[in-house]
Amino acid sequence: MTLFHFGNCFSLAYFPYFITYKCSGLSEYNAFWRCVQAGATYLFVRLCKMLFLATFFPTWEGGAGVYDFVGEFMKATVDMADLLGLHLVMSRNAGKGEYKIMVAAMGWATAELIMSRCIPLWVGARGIEFDWKYIQMSFDSNISLVHYIAMAAVVWMFTRYDLPKSFRLPVAILLGLCVYKGFLMELFVHVFLLGSWTALLVKAVLTGAISLCSLFLFVTLVHSN
């Protein structure tokens, strides 16, 4: 039963990545090693972020239940390094915009999935007692995939030299939402005392809204050129 539960969680977490890779056409471009390189860039960026946070933002030692608003906001600002990393990956790949976006997003999201959720699923989902948090973790990995695709698309649009002036403000707002989405979610959970399933639903809705706006801007920009 525990192995069956682990199989369900593993399939729910990993198969959407495999399906996205196959259906997006990346397999036809032999982009596997490009995605691996993007994943390696993610690991380097994450290491730099961890060193920076450990050096300049030590562990919060405030009272129980006290939310360090300024500290968490500054920590979230460090996630701007992800924007630089995605831009670096896309600038090193030749091809159409959608190809660059998918390579960067797939490599980035897959590396995060392996580093953040592989071991917890392997250790926890095979436990004797059933726990919904591993199902939630699997759903969250799918949300992260959508998030990174949207983020890569926004970064690609923001770095275009021919970006129309009317697009600059919406794209900048989307960049800010991509960077501070995690901070906003933590703030919502703390203020409104959201449960785990409610927080996951809010995160999915917020990610979906950002993704739809990014898709609309991307399609409009591509067709206008």
Curated annotation (Swiss-Prot):
Look up keyword Membrane and say if it applies: yes
Q: Which residues cross the membrane?
A: 1-21, 35-58, 69-90, 101-126, 132-157, 167-189, 197-218
Task: Give one Pfam hit by family name.
Answer: DUF2053
Q: Which GO terms describe its cellular component?
A: endoplasmic reticulum membrane; nuclear membrane; plasma membrane
Cross-referenced InterPro entries, in alphabetical order? Answer: TMEM147
Q: How does it sit in the membrane?
A: Multi-pass membrane protein
Q: Which UniProt keywords apply?
A: Cell membrane, Endoplasmic reticulum, Membrane, Transmembrane, Transmembrane helix
Q: Does the keyword Transmembrane apply?
A: yes
Q: Which family does it belong to?
A: Belongs to the TMEM147 family.
- Name listed for the protein in its UniProt record: BOS complex subunit TMEM147
Q: Which organism is it from?
A: Danio rerio (Zebrafish)
